[in-house]
Curated annotation (Swiss-Prot):
Locations listed in the record: Cytoplasm
Family matches, as InterPro entries: AceGlu_kinase-like_sf, Asp/Glu/Uridylate_kinase, Uridylate_kinase, Uridylate_kinase_bac
Protein name: Uridylate kinase
Reaction(s) the record says it catalyses: UMP + ATP = UDP + ADP
């Protein structure tokens, strides 16, 4: 069992694949999955993307740095919506960010993170790394290390890592376990290189799993075989 985990979610979990905005049935499912691991007794941090609000290619006509800042604010919107949804079912939750000072958001003070966890709060990190040119994958790796997580879970719509694209190659082989070195040398695109670098440096394992498989988060937290795991070299 892992005691403290960071869950990286795509914005699509708020609306469903290929959709936009917010879909209540998807959000109810998301809350249910988070509640399972909270009830199990682990400390939970969350980083969520903003793909349900907009996608990067839609902002190609403006400078990249501005597009990234818009993306950061999109993650704040999702974080606040998720906070409200978790609180509605009795889960204590706090949103922390370095990019905004809204009344419902607290600044990131790392001395406070352990206090939040000790008090039973889920901590949602909004606003990415607070700097442009970095992905939410990198933000998840950074926040996972900063909060002292012993597992990073990337919750996706696929059930793990494959040696080639299973949509294009019916013979693609699932890799249940792989090292950071192999993941990087194979050029696997499950996370960006900056995220791999941070996790590898601090020997933080990553589980890639299908979020839409009921109970997959809980199985990962329990240390059961689910998805694919990237282990330190």
């Amino acid at each position: 069992m892992y005691q403290r985990v960071l869950v990286k979610l795509s914005g699509e979990v708020m609306c469903g694949e290929g959709s936009r905005g917010f879909d209540q049935s998807n959000i109810n499912y998301l809350v249910q999955q988070i509640a399972q691991i909270v009830d199990y007794g682990v400390n939970v941090g969350i980083v969520i993307g903003a793909g349900n609000i907009f996608r990067g290619e839609e902002l190609s006509e403006i400078p990249h740095s501005l597009a990234d800042q818009i993306g950061m604010l999109g993650t704040v919107i999702n974080a606040l919506y998720l906070k409200g949804s978790l609180q509605k079912v009795g889960i204590k939750c706090v949103v922390v960010s370095q990019v905004t000072s809204l009344p419902s958001i607290r600044p990131i003070h790392y001395d406070d993170i352990n206090l939040y966890f000790d008090a039973g709060y889920v901590v949602i990190f909004a606003g990415g790394t607070s700097n442009p040119f970095f992905t939410t994958d990198t933000a998840a790796a950074l926040r996972a290390v900063e909060m002292g997580a012993n597992l990073l879970i990337k919750a996706t719509k696929v059930d793990g890592i494959y040696d080639s694209d299973p949509k294009k190659n019916k013979s693609a082989r699932k890799l249940d376990k792989i090292s950071y070195y192999d993941a990087i040398s194979r050029g696997l695109k499950v996370m960006d290189m900056e995220a791999f670098s941070i996790c590898g440096r601090y020997k933080l394992p990553i589980v890639i799993l299908n979020f839409f498989e009921d109970g997959s988060l809980l199985r990962a937290v329990r240390g059961e075989d689910v998805g694919s795991i990237i282990m330190p070299d």
